[in-house]
Amino acid sequence: MKTSGRLLFLCLAVGLLLESQAHPIADAEDATRNVGSDGTSVELSEILERGQDSSAEKGQRQNDHDVDESGHDIPFPS
């Protein structure tokens, strides 16, 4: 009985540890991340627009792949 109690306690402790790691506590930076300059929340479209802008910039930086004569991408240049 003693061993099963210790095993149960160990499982509960590990479960609580994993649960606390899965949901980090929000800090002040997280609370103000989606707040606009006037103190209201930023619209979803603005957030998505910013994300698309940064994605486009990343795509332009990584757009140095090879293209054959017909204009098709060459997936693995030789």
Swiss-Prot record:
Residues 1-22 form the signal peptide. One of its GO terms (cellular component) is extracellular region. Residues 34-43 have a biased composition (Polar residues). Residues 23-61 form a propeptide. Coiled coil: none annotated. GO terms for molecular function: toxin activity. Keywords: Pyrrolidone carboxylic acid, Secreted, Signal, Toxin. Expressed by the venom duct. The modification Pyrrolidone carboxylic acid is found at Q62. Residues 25-78 are annotated as: Disordered. The keyword Secreted applies. It is found in: Secreted. Residues 47-72 have a biased composition (Basic and acidic residues). The keyword Cell cycle does not apply. Belongs to the conotoxin H superfamily. The mature peptide does not contain cysteine residue. Probable toxin. This is Conotoxin ba1890.8. It comes from Conus bayani.
